[in-house]
From Swiss-Prot:
Post-translational note: Contains 4 disulfide bonds.
Protein name: U8-lycotoxin-Ls1t
Subcellular location: Secreted
GO MF: toxin activity
Residues making up the propeptide: 21-26
Keyword Signal set for record: yes
Disulphides: none
Known tissue expression: Expressed by the venom gland.
Pfam families linked: Toxin_35
Amino acid sequence: MKLIIFTGLVLFAIVSLIEAQAENEKACLPQYQVCTDAPGNCCSNLVCDCYGRYKSGTRIGRNCFCLQKGVIYKREN
């Protein structure tokens, strides 16, 4: 009986460890991917950069994208 309980606890510990490693190794978001709902998931050389959307001076939303660190984007007309 003790062997069955011990085996169950060991299996539970192994499964928990595997799940924790999978959580730490989740895939990062590549460049130009939307990160509005997951700002911390951009790959290491990228940053989640957010922009407000306005129409007639009223804010209508926000967009966030994984972009290169230190790069400034300007609007072209």
